[in-house]
């Protein structure tokens, strides 16, 4: 049985303090730059320029619920990958309910396009946490958006999701019911915007790793299970990593400070492709 959301929120406080510490107090010597891709105040992205040109760029999309402060609220993750030599791009985007679907997806495509066109990029690993995984999946699988923005999928080497909202029909917690109600104009839109419904036989066959905590009471594990099942149904390259005992917020521990014992598995996946 999942533990109650109330208990999970109590446990979150300790991790949020750790995130704050690494965001603003630790590793202050690590520099970053911010670039604008549009006119809205949230239309910018933060870049940590790594030292190893052989490594891919990490394009990390945060979840709107957890990181309303945008890239400033997840600098710890940028610093983590930077210390391993990666370039890291963290795009900001306009949030619901002030801005509804498809504004967030269009923002991500605009940020990605702006970065790629202004830099010499060979490979990109797209990562998304929580609702950011929905946006990450769209960047890889939304064919109409790729055509609209003229995105070259060939530079994306892999997709990694963390506790991702990948099947809206399985987002049954109160938190995500509220999120979806704010994100969409009506529940009738769910089928058409559900990330899992983007996958078909013609979808790109890039490697995908879905990471999910076994005790995630915010986003059901079924999201990742069903997403990987559908990818592999069409002969894709999907892998599922279930982390025993992990709750939704615990996944961030993988990429803060020095990471933990499971971080190596994910870094190994990144380095394989």
Predicted regions and their residues:
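Alpha/beta-hydrolase superfamily serine-hydrolase fold, recognizing
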Residues: 1-273
